[in-house]
Every structure is written in structure tokens, then in C-alpha cells.
Amino acid sequence: MSEAKRLAAEKAIDYVEDGMIVGVGTGSTVAYFIDALGRIGHRIKGAVSSSEQSTARLRQHGIEVLDLNHTGTLSLYVDGADECDPNRCLIKGGGAALTREKIIAEASERFICIVDPSKQVPVLGNFPLPVEVIPMARSLVARQILALTGGQPVWRDGVVTDNGNVVLDVHNLHITDPVALERNLNQIPGVVCVGLFARRPADVVIVGGETPRVL
């Protein structure tokens, strides 16, 4: 699947225009995009990064990493996904960067999601849904998620997000209404961010392959 990821990432470069500040996500597919972006780094003004991991890789390529507070609205955000449904709703957060990813997606006019074919699903939920949580609320949030969804929340032990929080991965979900679930989970006190990108789905999904498909 690594070749499919690379091909999806290379196709996303077609959406990068001269003078842009590019929002950049996190993960193995995005790493290929950053490498491709490095080849045209002289054409862009810089990037806004969703994680320390991506920031380090961008800087290795000599791309300036900018503060979103100083850039205003971004023209383009490119990121991967753990799952993608036919409506371009996503599960994201396997790399624990979901909060910053969601902030940058919200701040961007266009959100391009790059995936390999294994990430396409008819219904979201086979991949455990990440939820970023304030540490003191971990048990409270887990109980409320169980009561609300019937899914099984599992603490991702040993993982601390770039924001200093913890992650619960919710297993055994069958998400037929991702917009409603995103809204309801966000209302639980202690939840920082839910790894459902449904209220703000991707605008374009690029599925890697010998001939990448654009959805």
C-alpha cells in the first residue's frame, strides 16, 4: 500500500498553486506529500503543520512552518484518513493529531484527503474512533461514551497528544449518522475533539493507485 499512498500524495501536488500557504496534516501518507512538496518548496510561501512530527519533516525540506494565528484562512489543506465513507466523511486521529488537524481543516477553503484504497469503507466505524480528552476526565468520558454509543472506549495508554491530552479509541461502532455522532460526542464535558470529520468533511478525496482516482 505504500506505493498507493505515494501516488495519492503526488496527485495532491496538482492542487498546490504558486504563493500558497499549505495546511499539512499528519501520518504516513502525508509524509509522502511533504516529500513531494519539498521539491516545489520554492514556489510556496510556507506551511501550517498539524503536528510536531510533520513540522520536523517540513523543516528538513527547508519549508517555513507558520503559525495559523498569523496566516488567516488557508487556501488548501492536505491530510490523510484512517477511514473514508462515500460522503467523504472521515475517521482521523490514528496518529493522535486530530485536534490540530480539525482546526486546520476548519481554517481551510479546500480540504484534500489522500488515502490508499484500503481506507475506503461503506460505513465508518471499523477503525476505532479516536477521541482526545482532558486527562482528569478520561474515566468520566469513557463511561459517557459507552452509555451514548454502546461502543467500547479503550485508553491509548502511554500516548500524550501535542496538546498534553490523552486519547480514547472507541471500538465496535457502526456510524450511520456521523454528523450527529460528532455533535453528540463533542457535548460530553472533557472531550477536546472527536476524530470524526463529518460536519466538515473532505472536499476532494484522492485514492492512490496506478491511476489515482479523484472523488
UniProtKB/Swiss-Prot annotation:
It catalyses: aldehydo-D-ribose 5-phosphate = D-ribulose 5-phosphate. InterPro entries: NagB/RpiA_transferase-like (IPR037171), Ribose5P_isomerase_typA_subgr (IPR020672), Ribose5P_isomerase_type_A (IPR004788). Keywords: Isomerase. It comes from the Bacteria. Its EC number is 5.3.1.6. The active site is at 101 (proton acceptor). The keyword Membrane does not apply. One of its GO terms (biological process) is D-ribose metabolic process. GO terms for molecular function: ribose-5-phosphate isomerase activity. SUPFAM superfamilies: D-ribose-5-phosphate isomerase (RpiA), lid domain, NagB/RpiA/CoA transferase-like. Substrate binds at residues 26-29, 79-82, 92-95, 119. One of its GO terms (cellular component) is cytosol. Pathway: Carbohydrate degradation; pentose phosphate pathway; D-ribose 5-phosphate from D-ribulose 5-phosphate (non-oxidative stage): step 1/1. The keyword Isomerase applies. Homodimer. Belongs to the ribose 5-phosphate isomerase family. PANTHER family: RIBOSE-5-PHOSPHATE ISOMERASE (PTHR11934:SF0). Catalyzes the reversible conversion of ribose-5-phosphate to ribulose 5-phosphate. This is Ribose-5-phosphate isomerase A. The lineage of its organism: Bacteria, Pseudomonadati, Pseudomonadota, Gammaproteobacteria, Lysobacterales. The gene is rpiA.
